[in-house]
Curated annotation (Swiss-Prot):
Pfam families registered for this protein in UniProt: Tektin (PF03148)
Record keyword Cytoplasm present: yes
Superkingdom of the source species: Eukaryota
GO cellular component: axonemal A tubule inner sheath; microtubule cytoskeleton; sperm flagellum
Post-translational modification: Ubiquitinated, leading to its degradation. Deubiquitinated by USP16, promoting its stability.
The protein's name: Tektin-5
PANTHER family in alphabetical order: TEKTIN, TEKTIN-5
UniProtKB keywords: Cell projection, Cilium, Coiled coil, Cytoplasm, Cytoskeleton, Flagellum, Ubl conjugation
Any coiled-coil regions, as ranges: 158-188, 225-264, 346-383, 427-447
UniProt keyword annotation of Plastid present: no
Protein's organism: Bos taurus (Bovine)
Record-stated family: Belongs to the tektin family.
Length: 489
């Protein structure tokens, strides 16, 4: 049997060769290195495979015995007649060969180790340099994205501000138009607004559906508006044309805002991406695609032009409203008192509703805090119960194990008393905690019911406040009964 790592030239594997020139076996050629690696490219890393080894190594087995040596061994076998007459037929290496071989092995190992150490150090420095470069590039990109988000936020705020002012102007202009048309049709629009307030207030819920001072003043105002007549048709036509132009400017602002919202969402998503994000992937050749259609200068100019156009439209609208306001002065004296009285009643009612709503919200906040504390108490009680179960299991297991003691060893000793007492004590503790847990849960249920009632009352008050403040008062801001009704603040 041939052992792994042995050669056929060892002294115990064959007789001595007849040649006397050399006592050493022929030296086999060194390990042959074959380049057999075909690189495998990951997606996006066709030219970034420096982290993989460039070679696989295959070591060829050395031929350690020549054909002639085999012939010599087969020809010269030692005689088996008398062991005493055997000659020294086995060749051996010299101590110098042995020392030289060891030195060569040690030197080779040391050289390989030093080379590997240098390669490791260089690799670590290379990785650190590339990591620092990658981190700096990523931080720079994040800063640029943050600056871009700041620019988008600035223009969004400008567009929102202008859009809000344009919308307010459109509402005001629409109110002027309605007032002019209604003046031409015997002030039917003021009558409709007053009736709409009454209609909206009919949508109040529950106890808030009261016949209050606001409703009385609205009914009185409806009766007074029916007496007013005026015609302003020509100015209404000009206002209608201006409103169409305002809507065009509004749509341009809204489209610009929508695009900026989308861009802000995308850039914010890009800014929040990290190396550990789940949604990152390879996109081959994306850096070669340039689908941009603007530069920062033209991008800013586009929004600035939209804002300037909207400002021009608002200026035209303001001039038209001022012209209409001069016509409304004739009607102002007749409806001023009733309009003021109704508004004062609305403000007083809104103040009352706001005060009640704030009190309910305060009580709801306290109730929610108490619910939170009660839930925490329930959680702590449940944890405490769970924490007591393991000691109870331990004590019961100990008792059960001690019941298996043999014969007279089954003694009612001090540990037995202690274990029994421990089981009773822990069980009593568990029962007490479970009772307290049930009581706490009942309290939590009561608090939840209270919260539901408060939320229902808050919904009623919020609905009433929305009707009076957001709907009725918003409509009455464009109500044509005072000199200032043509211009919205």
């Amino acid at each position: 049997m041939e052992f792994l790592g042995t050669t056929q030239t060892a002294t115990y594997c064959g007789p001595k060769k007849p040649c006397g020139g050399s006592v050493l076996p022929s030296v086999a050629s060194g390990p042959t290195v074959q380049e057999c690696y075909q690189p495998y490219y990951l997606p996006g890393y066709r030219y970034l495979n420096a982290w993989r080894p460039s070679l696989f190594y295959k070591v060829a087995n050395a031929q350690t015995c020549l054909d002639e040596g085999a012939t010599c061994r087969s020809a010269l076998r030692p005689p088996t007649i008398l062991p005493a007459v055997r000659s020294a037929l086995f060749c051996r290496y010299s101590p110098q060969d042995w020392d030289q071989s060891n030195r060569l092995q040690l030197c080779g190992a040391e050289a390989s180790r030093l080379w590997a150490g240098r390669m490791t150090g260089d690799s670590m420095r290379l990785m650190q340099d590339k990591d620092q470069l990658t981190r700096q590039m990523q931080e720079g990109t994040c800063r640029n994205l943050g600056q871009r988000l700041s620019d988008i936020g600035f223009w969004k705020s400008e567009l929102n501000y202008e859009l809000e002012r344009l919308l307010n102007e459109n509402h005001s202009l629409d109110a002027i138009k309605r007032r002019l048309e209604c003046a031409a049709e015997e002030l039917r629009c003021p009558l409709q607004v007053a009736l709409e307030c009454l209609y909206q207030r009919e949508k109040r819920i529950g106890i808030d559906l009261v016949h209050d001072n606001v409703e009385k003043n609205l009914i009185r105002e409806v009766d007074m508006i029916k007496c007013c007549q005026e015609q302003m048709r020509k100015l209404a036509q000009r206002i209608d044309i201006q409103m169409r132009e305002n809507r065009d400017a509004q749509h341009a602002l809204e489209r610009d805002l929508e695009d900026k919202n989308s861009a802000e969402f995308i850039d914010e998503k890009c800014l929040n991406l990290r190396n550990t994000s789940d949604c990152i992937s390879f996109f081959h050749g994306v850096e070669k695609i340039d689908g941009t259609i603007s530069v920062p200068e033209t991008w800013a100019k586009f929004s600035n032009d939209n804002i300037r156009h909207s400002q021009n439209m608002r200026a035209n609208s303001i001039r038209l409203r001022e012209e209409a306001q001069n016509l409304f002065d004739v009607l102002a004296d007749q409806l001023w008192r009733q309009f003021t009285n109704t508004n004062l009643a609305f403000n007083a009612r809104i103040a009352e509703e706001t005060d009640v709503k704030n009190k309910l919200q305060t009580q709801l906040a306290k109730t929610l805090q108490e619910i939170f504390q009660t839930e925490n108490t329930i959680m702590l009680l449940e944890r405490s119960i769970m924490a007591k179960e393991c000691p109870l299991k331990v004590a019961q297991t100990r008792l059960e194990c001690r019941t298996r003691r043999p014969n007279v060893e089954l003694c009612r000793d001090s540990p037995q008393f202690k274990l029994v007492n421990e089981v009773f004590t822990i069980d009593d503790t568990l029962q007490t905690l479970k009772l307290r847990l049930r009581e706490t849960r009942d309290t939590l249920q009561l608090l939840v019911m209270t919260k539901c009632r408060l939320e229902h009352e808050l919904a009623i008050k919020a609905n009433t406040l929305c009707i009076d403040k957001e709907k009725c008062m918003a409509m009455r801001k464009t109500f044509p009964s005072t000199p200032c009704m043509g211009i919205c603040p």
